[in-house]
């Protein structure tokens, strides 16, 4: 039922719009126009003001024609860098970037699937329950749009987030919590050539701590990483301060706590040995979610997959998304693949057939809500 040519044309338009995190104004204005052209009103919340962006989240409620639970269809408007001056091109069966920027299919492909589903529902007069469309800002780097969404407008029971790569039919039903970790290692400055004995190297403390740390893949549901290290002024000065940004993730709360405590202990022990000190702060970036196989939303997906002739793949992921936040707000939500590939790179691409198939799957989902 979806219009392939229309989807391709509109997707090319969407990914050509500059829409970096906190700078989604042009994308938001474009989507408001498109939703109004279909026949729906749009609310813009004040999330942008809260996070220092130039637009808020968009919320569009489509009243249903039958009495079934309301659903939320969600995608995010922002892209990662390099994302300015994107020039998409069709290369055979794929739409790709020109190799100098990301394509922006993360998450314009999700946005496009939602727009096309709404049009088809209207054109074909298909029955459906209430649909709440949510296009968020600043998903990349912190899920800030979803965290600051005005939930007073949201009453959907189920959420379908179109923001995942992989095979069409792949559904992320379990995702981790993440702790962002900020560490300051304090040493003592001294002349590196004339009085190194009087100094305490913060770099040496940090190196000792990290060398003892369990990092990377800890187990099947837990990971940890040291991402950013800054420190030092000159080669002839013993470094007195190092700032480190790290993270730990796990789909198990106790494992996340254990890994975070382990990283703290490594830093504190190393600082004690060398006579320095450490300031260690861990902040919860987002909570985990786990949708059981007998949850109502899984039943909806199973029926939709069968009607759309799609193999349903219930998967666990190591990444976070707006889906984590929606579940924490009481919305039973899953993350659905829309076929994006090689995301967050200049090699990003999407198979046109996959995007079309994802839109068809979304239509089937809407029609199978009961």
Go through each PLM region and give its residues.
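N-terminal capping segment at the start of a domain
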Residues: 1-25, 284, 341-345
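Active-site metal-coordination/substrate-binding segment of hydrolases
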Residues: 28, 53-54, 61-135, 152, ...
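Metal-dependent amide/peptide-bond hydrolase catalytic core
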Residues: 202-370
